[in-house]
Amino acid sequence: DIILQLAINARTGLRKLPSNVRLVDWIPMGVFLNGADGFIHHGGAGNTLTALYSGIPQIVFGEGADRSVNAEIVAKRGCGIIPDKHGLTSDLVNRLLYDDSLRFCSDQVAAEMAEQPSPAEIAEVLMRKLKNNGK
């Protein structure tokens, strides 16, 4: 099944969707990606980092702002694919869903991210250093 998150104002000209596609206005990424097999998105930092944290392979379009950099990082790390001039194809989607190396690399990055200290832990260290003149 496919969940298609698309704002109402972006639906002009949208064709009838197959029965296995559920159209939603908005859904929290953490909930959406829990149990997902793949994620296709524009490459914004929120989507990219949430997918990396969740261990989900990605197809990242990466057009505009920081999105191209995010897409390149995901692809270089082996966690995703940047579409070429042909755009999104069935071959690309099949690779996203069935390429074990994409899943393996995505799982590795998720494990690395999980090992990082939490923001609260970092804040505690910084506060201690401030109180002790940087020591």
Per-range role (PLM):
Residues 1-4, 59-60, 81-83:
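Short hydrophobic alpha-helical runs that function as membrane-insertion/retention elements
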Residues 35-36, 77, 116:
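Structured helix-beta-strand junction loops
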Residues 24-73:
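A donor-sugar binding/catalytic signature common to diverse glycosyltransferases
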Residues 15, 72-76, 107:
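Class I S-adenosyl-L-methionine
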Residues 1-38:
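Donor-nucleotide binding loops and adjacent catalytic segments primarily
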Residues 90-135:
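C-terminal amphipathic helix plus adjacent low-complexity
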